[in-house]
């Protein structure tokens, strides 16, 4: 998320050829199906925790770049940004002191949703045998092992599935709550 955030801030603030290059790179990443990309990388590299973290990070940064870019495009023409430019504040300081703090609430909410998505990606890749490998523990591995015993030991697959569902639901609810708490429109209502 950090790489995507930096790329999005630079792209949105400076515009021009930087924006074009960053957005074409994100378009290229979006054109590749996430699961297919992850499967290719995980079959080329040694499947394990570090490889899985790398794959999830590489597949998530374009989303952050687009989200942050759209926020920056909305902020860069605000009066306080224009005033900062007028008094000679450098672009770096404007990005760090004015833009970054104002996109932080959106970034936090999107990060919680990204965590939920990452859990689902990890579980699905581990279920397919491309993620975390036994004897390491993963809900996806537990689901994969339990599917062979559904008729006799149904709980082996049911409880990991419920755990995944409840965890993702809890994280999504946390993201919605954070959105409501951090939304500037709701500040006067509390």
At which residue positions do the language-model features occur?
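Alpha-helical transmembrane segments of integral membrane proteins
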Residues: 1-190
């Amino acid at each position: 998320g950090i790489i995507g955030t930096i790329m999005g801030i630079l792209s949105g603030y400076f515009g021009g050829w930087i924006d074009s290059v960053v957005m074409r790179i994100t378009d290229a990443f979006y054109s590749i199906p996430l699961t297919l990309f992850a499967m290719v990388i995980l079959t080329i590299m040694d499947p394990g925790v570090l490889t899985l973290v790398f794959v999830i990070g590489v597949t998530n940064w374009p989303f952050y770049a687009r989200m942050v870019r759209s926020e920056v495009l909305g902020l860069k023409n605000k009066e306080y940004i224009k005033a900062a430019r007028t008094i000679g504040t450098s672009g770096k300081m404007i990005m760090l002191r004015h833009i970054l703090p104002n996109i932080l609430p959106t970034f936090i909410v999107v990060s919680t949703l990204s965590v939920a998505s990452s859990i689902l990606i990890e579980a699905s890749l581990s279920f397919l045998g491309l993620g975390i490998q036994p004897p390491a523990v993963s809900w996806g591995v537990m689901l994969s092992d339990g599917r062979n015993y559904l008729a006799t030991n149904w709980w082996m697959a049911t409880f990991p599935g419920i755990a995944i569902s409840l965890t993702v639901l809890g994280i999504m609810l946390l993201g919605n709550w954070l959105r409501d708490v951090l939304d500037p429109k709701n500040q006067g209502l509390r």
